[in-house]
Structure formats: structure tokens, C-alpha cells
Amino acid sequence: MASKDFAIGMILLSQIMVGFLGNFFLLYHYSFLCFTRGMLQSTDLILKHLTIANSLVILSKGIPQTMAAFGLKDSLSDIGCKFVFYVHRVGRAVCVGNACLLSVFQVITISPSEFRWAELKLHAHKYIRSFILVLCWILNTLVNITVLLHVTGKWNSINSTKTNDYGYCSGGSRSRIPHSLHIVLLSSLDVLCLGLMTLASGSMVFILHRHKQQVQHIHGTNLSARSSPESRVTQSILVLVSTLCYFTRSPPSLHMSLFPNPSWWLLNTSALITACFPMVSPFVLMSRHPRIPRLGSACCGRNPQFPKLVR
């Protein structure tokens, strides 16, 4: 085993452990809320599904890539390769969809009554579960089903000269036109979600900035320097959106989608980048989101008081 492969394997293993710990804590938190309250609030429900999707991405991409880095490149069968590739694609798409839904739902929730979309508050709370189920899970499971047609195990592609090597699995030969159409479809969904997230985040910054100015006008300019719940929510959403935009549309990820037979450097760089958002997002939420306790507070048995800004 080359030293560079061992180093990549250790980094991937560290990402899996850290990401799994953060997402497991959030899943435990939301499961506890579900059992104690009987039903999760809308924001909690979105974050729960985002956490589930994060876990799917970490496990389906991180574990096979780590095994390949440690020399176990032929460990997955044909069915195993199809399964992990399909789960990873669906999990990644659901991550983007839930993050988009979270941004849009948050800006609707905190919109003042004079905003036009404030009328959507009641409808958004009522149909949020349908949005998550249909737009995030069902749509993405259908769109990504073509993965099952071209991904195979490496042992099943040894005698084929028209395969794309992805480290632990292979992609069979495909017609360029259907493949290009599939890439355009997936990219269009990503661009739509990322555009909605950017618009919603910008609107939220504007709303919260105007709210801060109104508070300063009422109470004077001598406000506490401590970060307010409004600014913490704004920062957490902006960090999540910025992180997702960068790691989803990074140059290595785009290159992996457009060009076959990626190099060793591109293959492993893409794997490291792919795991960054699922690994970072739970800790961003725990550190700044007012409704989620910090990991240290939960471990020490503290019960922090949550602001009521986010519903």
C-alpha cells in the first residue's frame, strides 16, 4: 500500500467518524423530541431528514472509498456497487433538497405580516411533510434510478475496455446523449435548489437586518454585544448554504460528473470534498442554531433554554 493511499484512507476514516458522531447526536436529539412531544415541529422535521441524508452520504461514499484507499478495491459485488452508488446519489440529492426547503421555510416563517409570502405560513406548516416526502425523497429516488443501469462491480468489468474506473466500482459504457441528458437534468435540479437557497438566504438577511434596526430604534443603540438569536440563525443558514454551494459544485465534483476515468488525485479529492458538508453541517447547527443543544451541553446533562425565534 502506498503512503499516499494510507494517508487518504486515514483522512476519510476521520471524516466518517466525526460526521457519524455529529449526525448520530442530531438523530438522537430529534428522536427524543419525537418520543417526548409526539410530533416534531416543521423545522425539526426538515433538519431530521437532512441529518438522515447526511448519514447516507457519509456511509455510502465514505466507507467504500476508505476500503479502496486501504487496498480493498474489489470487495463490492455488482449488486453492492449499484446499491452504494444509488444510495449516495439519492442521499446527496436529498441533502440539497432539504437544505433548500429549510432556507425557504425559514424565510417564510420569520416574514413580517406585510410581506406577500407571509400568507404562505399556514400552508407551509400544513404541507411540509408532503414536500419532504414527494419533492425530496420520491423525486430523487426516481431521477437517480439510472445509476442502477451502468454501475457494476470491478470484477464484472475486467474484460471490458469501455469502463470508467471509480476506485471501488466501475461504470459501464454509456451512450453520450442519454448520459448528457441525465447530467443536464441533475444539474438543473441542483441549480434550481441552490438558486432558491441563495434567494431565501438573502431575503432572510434583509428581514433580520431590518428587525435589528427596529429594535435599535426602540431600545436605543446601547445593545449588548453578545450575538442575538437572530444573528445566530442568520449565520448558521448562511454558513450551511455557502458550504453546500461550494462542496456541491466544486471543480472536482463537476469534473467527476463530466469526464470519465478520473485520475487518482481527482477521485480522492472528490471523495474528501463530498464528505465535507455532511460532516460539517451538524456541528454548524449545534454551534449556532438556537433550537439545538450543543454536544457538550447534552453530554454534561445541561438543559439550555432555547429562544423562540425559529418555529
UniProtKB/Swiss-Prot annotation:
<keyword id="KW-0325">Glycoprotein</keyword>
<keyword id="KW-0807">Transducer</keyword>
<feature type="transmembrane region" description="Helical; Name=3">
    <location>
        <begin position="93"/>
        <end position="113"/>
    </location>
</feature>
<dbReference type="GO" id="GO:0007606">
    <property type="term" value="P:sensory perception of chemical stimulus"/>
</dbReference>
<feature type="transmembrane region" description="Helical; Name=6">
    <location>
        <begin position="233"/>
        <end position="249"/>
    </location>
</feature>
<feature type="topological domain" description="Cytoplasmic">
    <location>
        <begin position="209"/>
        <end position="232"/>
    </location>
</feature>
<feature type="transmembrane region" description="Helical; Name=2">
    <location>
        <begin position="52"/>
        <end position="72"/>
    </location>
</feature>
<feature type="topological domain" description="Cytoplasmic">
    <location>
        <begin position="114"/>
        <end position="130"/>
    </location>
</feature>
<feature type="glycosylation site" description="N-linked (GlcNAc...) asparagine">
    <location>
        <position position="159"/>
    </location>
</feature>
<comment type="similarity">
    <text>Belongs to the G-protein coupled receptor 1 family.</text>
</comment>
<keyword id="KW-0589">Pheromone response</keyword>
<feature type="transmembrane region" description="Helical; Name=4">
    <location>
        <begin position="131"/>
        <end position="151"/>
    </location>
</feature>
<feature type="topological domain" description="Extracellular">
    <location>
        <begin position="152"/>
        <end position="187"/>
    </location>
</feature>
<dbReference type="Pfam" id="PF03402">
    <property type="entry name" value="V1R"/>
</dbReference>
<dbReference type="InterPro" id="IPR017452">
    <property type="entry name" value="GPCR_Rhodpsn_7TM"/>
</dbReference>
<feature type="topological domain" description="Extracellular">
    <location>
        <begin position="73"/>
        <end position="92"/>
    </location>
</feature>
<feature type="transmembrane region" description="Helical; Name=5">
    <location>
        <begin position="188"/>
        <end position="208"/>
    </location>
</feature>
<feature type="topological domain" description="Extracellular">
    <location>
        <begin position="1"/>
        <end position="5"/>
    </location>
</feature>
<dbReference type="GO" id="GO:0016503">
    <property type="term" value="F:pheromone receptor activity"/>
</dbReference>
<keyword id="KW-0297">G-protein coupled receptor</keyword>
<feature type="topological domain" description="Cytoplasmic">
    <location>
        <begin position="27"/>
        <end position="51"/>
    </location>
</feature>
<feature type="topological domain" description="Cytoplasmic">
    <location>
        <begin position="286"/>
        <end position="311"/>
    </location>
</feature>
<keyword id="KW-0472">Membrane</keyword>
<dbReference type="GO" id="GO:0019236">
    <property type="term" value="P:response to pheromone"/>
</dbReference>
<protein>
    <recommendedName>
        <fullName>Vomeronasal type-1 receptor 3</fullName>
    </recommendedName>
</protein>
<feature type="transmembrane region" description="Helical; Name=7">
    <location>
        <begin position="265"/>
        <end position="285"/>
    </location>
</feature>
<keyword id="KW-0675">Receptor</keyword>
<feature type="transmembrane region" description="Helical; Name=1">
    <location>
        <begin position="6"/>
        <end position="26"/>
    </location>
</feature>
<dbReference type="InterPro" id="IPR004072">
    <property type="entry name" value="Vmron_rcpt_1"/>
</dbReference>
<keyword id="KW-1003">Cell membrane</keyword>
<keyword id="KW-1133">Transmembrane helix</keyword>
<keyword id="KW-0812">Transmembrane</keyword>
<comment type="function">
    <text>Putative pheromone receptor.</text>
</comment>
<feature type="topological domain" description="Extracellular">
    <location>
        <begin position="250"/>
        <end position="264"/>
    </location>
</feature>
<dbReference type="GO" id="GO:0005886">
    <property type="term" value="C:plasma membrane"/>
</dbReference>
